[in-house]
Amino acid sequence: MNTGEYERVYVELERYSGPLSGVADVGGVPHYFHAADPDQVEDRFYVWPIAPEVFVLERECWAIFVRWNERYELGEAGPESHPGVGGIDERYDELEERLKPSREVPADARLLVGRAEFLIDEEVPRYRVEGCDYAMRWSSP
């Protein structure tokens, strides 16, 4: 598989020096992606389709985070108010709990190479309700 095209990233669940997990299009269809080995330089990810109803919940959870991040970037909120701390936003906590099983890498997940292409535009925030400031290109290992 080599789509040749960079595809949209809707949700970033984890990041270190680059994306580690989230939700992105793979072949034009929303999938979870999760780094096969976060300590390796190679960008190999397990990918698996996300059910439409779960996709809606992921986007809702992401929107809560993005709204917090906007306040954080403006200096109006501190890290202690991050919804991921728990007990800050009841709906966020509920969504996180409901989404845990779907975020687990299934035995039939595909292994792909993912390359991130970051947008270099000071006017575009890193995180937006529509997604992230990068796209992914997928290919076979």
Whereabouts are the PLM-identified features?
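Short linear, low-complexity motifs centered on an aromatic residue
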Residues: 32-52
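Amphipathic, interaction-prone secondary-structure segments
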Residues: 2-38
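Low-complexity intrinsically disordered segments
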Residues: 46-141
